[in-house]
């Protein structure tokens, strides 16, 4: 292992569970790069300005940002990438000699795993469960890269769905966003792509259920669909299992995890992450856990 000269890290609240240190430190070791990635837990949003000033003062090379700080950090970096501006959120910060660039690699995290299915998605309806930041990243990836005939948001609170749509339409009035209640079964069944952009199904997280769809709603899934669950732990969520049983193409959340990490890694190091090797190692790690 080479001598460590640069620090990378993750800022968030109660994020000791994160697999990001494993991914980035494994990649750095494989490529013999002098980077070490660690976790910085921040208890309160009011500490973000001090944290980023500390990043400048200490020469921390780069940071990932996770919930609940992806929006607030946009106010304290020096520049925002086009992607970060599009979704109003930063998940990656690059320190360029004290000048902090805020970027968003979540959009690439959604887009990259869908590349093999581009023709299937073009001018076909796509659906997203959720109305938060992850859903917004999914909307932007679909709008920018895949041009579906409709982007349907399936939400429990239509007002929140409308707020997200208004945010997108402020910059892209042509975006084909449609708002549906969570029980709009015909609209769900008609989607060629369904993305779970909620934390439902995450190991150890208390939510209203453990799947984006209830067991009795499995009949809505079929072999003409692509099912993408952003949740990566557990590897096989109830939603993924339902989709596999229905014969759908399944994209597990680990693919988004790796894709967004690879994009961040390249921004910090200028190097290409060995994603196939990383995928093999993280799948082994996720499979081995109790």
From Swiss-Prot:
UniProt superkingdom: Bacteria
Keywords (A to Z) from UniProt: Amino-acid biosynthesis, Aromatic amino acid biosynthesis, NADP, Oxidoreductase
GO molecular function, one term: NADP binding
Annotated Gene3D superfamilies: Leucine Dehydrogenase, chain A, domain 1, NAD(P)-binding Rossmann-like Domain
EC class of the enzyme, as a word: oxidoreductase
Signal sequence annotation: none
Residues that bind NADP(+): 130-134, 230, 253
Disulfide bonds: none
Gene Ontology biological process terms from the UniProt entry: amino acid biosynthetic process; aromatic amino acid family biosynthetic process; chorismate biosynthetic process; shikimate metabolic process
Function: Involved in the biosynthesis of the chorismate, which leads to the biosynthesis of aromatic amino acids. Catalyzes the reversible NADPH linked reduction of 3-dehydroshikimate (DHSA) to yield shikimate (SA).
Family stated for the protein in its record: Belongs to the shikimate dehydrogenase family.
UniProt protein name: Shikimate dehydrogenase (NADP(+))
Native organism: Prosthecochloris aestuarii (strain DSM 271 / SK 413)
Source species taxonomy: Bacteria, Pseudomonadati, Chlorobiota, Chlorobiia, Chlorobiales
Underlying gene: aroE
């Amino acid at each position: 292992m080479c001598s460590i000269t640069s620090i990378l890290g993750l800022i968030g609240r109660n994020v000791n569970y994160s697999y990001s240190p494993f991914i980035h430190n494994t990649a750095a070791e494989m490529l013999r790069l002098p980077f070490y990635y660690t976790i910085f837990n921040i208890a309160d949003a009011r500490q973000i300005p001090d944290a980023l000033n500390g990043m400048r003062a200490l020469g921390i090379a780069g940071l990932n940002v996770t919930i609940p700080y992806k929006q607030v950090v946009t106010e304290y970096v020096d520049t925002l990438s086009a992607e970060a501006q599009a979704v109003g959120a930063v998940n990656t910060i690059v320190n360029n000699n004290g000048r902090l660039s805020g970027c968003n690699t979540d959009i690439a995290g959604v887009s990259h795993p869908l590349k093999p299915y581009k023709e299937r998605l073009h001018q076909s309806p796509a659906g997203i469960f959720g109305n938060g930041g992850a859903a917004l990243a999914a909307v932007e990836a679909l709008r920018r890269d895949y041009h579906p005939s409709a982007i349907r948001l399936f939400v429990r609170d239509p007002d929140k769905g409308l707020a997200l749509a208004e945010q997108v339409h402020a910059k892209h009035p042509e975006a084909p966003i449609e708002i549906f209640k969570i029980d709009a079964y015909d609209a769900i069944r008609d989607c060629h792509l369904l993305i779970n952009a909620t934390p439902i199904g995450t190991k150890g997280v208390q939510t209203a259920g453990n799947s984006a769809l209830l067991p009795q709603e499995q009949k809505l899934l079929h072999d003409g669909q692509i099912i993408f669950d952003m949740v990566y732990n557990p590897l096989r969520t109830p939603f993924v299992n339902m989709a596999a049983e229905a014969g759908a193409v399944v994209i597990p959340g680990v693919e988004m995890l790796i894709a967004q990490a690879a994009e961040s890694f390249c921004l910090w190091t200028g190097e290409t992450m060995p994603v196939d090797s990383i995928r093999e190692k993280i799948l082994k790690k996720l499979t081995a856990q109790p």
